[in-house]
Amino acid sequence: MKKLHDLVILENVLIAKETYKMSLKAETMDFVELAPGNFINIKIDKGGAPLLRRPISIFDADEEQKVLKIIYKDLGYGTHLMTKLLPGDILNVLGPLGTGFPIENTPDAALLVGGGVGIPPLYELGKRLRDKGTKVTSVLGFRDAQSMFCLEDFRTLGEVYISTEDGSFGQKGFVTDAITSHDPDFDTIYACGPKVMLKALDDAYKGKKEGYLSFEERMACGIGACYACMIDTKDGLKRVCKDGPVFKLGEVTYE
């Protein structure tokens, strides 16, 4: 499968506080082999800087239209440059990359748990689970109401519960508070977000539920060659970009 692609930007719009959605025409990408939880590594050219590509998870993959959608936050120099890109601009990407969420054996009921910029990859996963007959419940955590995005997209998958840190919408606190409050029924948990959130879910459910956690780490090459994104697991150090970003519940040791 070809990994380097020049994709045409179709849309690049602000959808929430410091949060953008970008649509990309991906004629050369093999959508059949694209797994939920995969990411693309984006090259941003601006006088030769920044040097490193930016890893961004895939929010939505439309095989029929050959369109990829990503959601990103304006958090630094590289992503700020991305906000200036316009429809018709060409974006060089490496991908799809990483080991995504397994969906061969789908559960009867799934719980999707996302925090902040960890929310986007769960949507493509939820679509595929729903289409296979799984009951999907989503718990999404944001800093505040102004930071919320794509709620209607997730509502097409099933029940959605929201937490905000300041209590401006939904449950005040974190996703773990919303889970405790609503107590959704599920067989398998799928989550992506800050490591502190993933650890809390790991501690709560390992040995009790099946689950998969997608980790966010700083990356360089995106293909496992540079060893810049190592993570501790019970089987030793692993590369988030290649062996992950998705790991089984209980696999990461958080050392």
Predicted feature descriptions by range:
Residues 11, 60, 162-164, 213-215, ...:
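Structural signal for conserved beta-strand scaffold positions within catalytic alpha/beta enzyme cores
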Residues 45-47, 96, 234:
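Short, surface-exposed secondary-structure boundary micro-motifs
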Residues 47-56, 98-105, 241:
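Short, Lys/Arg- and Gly-enriched loop/turn segments at beta-strand edges
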Residues 243-255:
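Short microdomains enriched in Cys/His and/or Lys/Arg
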Residues 77-216:
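FNR/FR-type flavoprotein reductase catalytic core
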Residues 121, 216-245:
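Local cysteine-cluster metal-coordination motifs and their immediate loop/turn environment
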Residues 2-87:
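Ferredoxin-reductase
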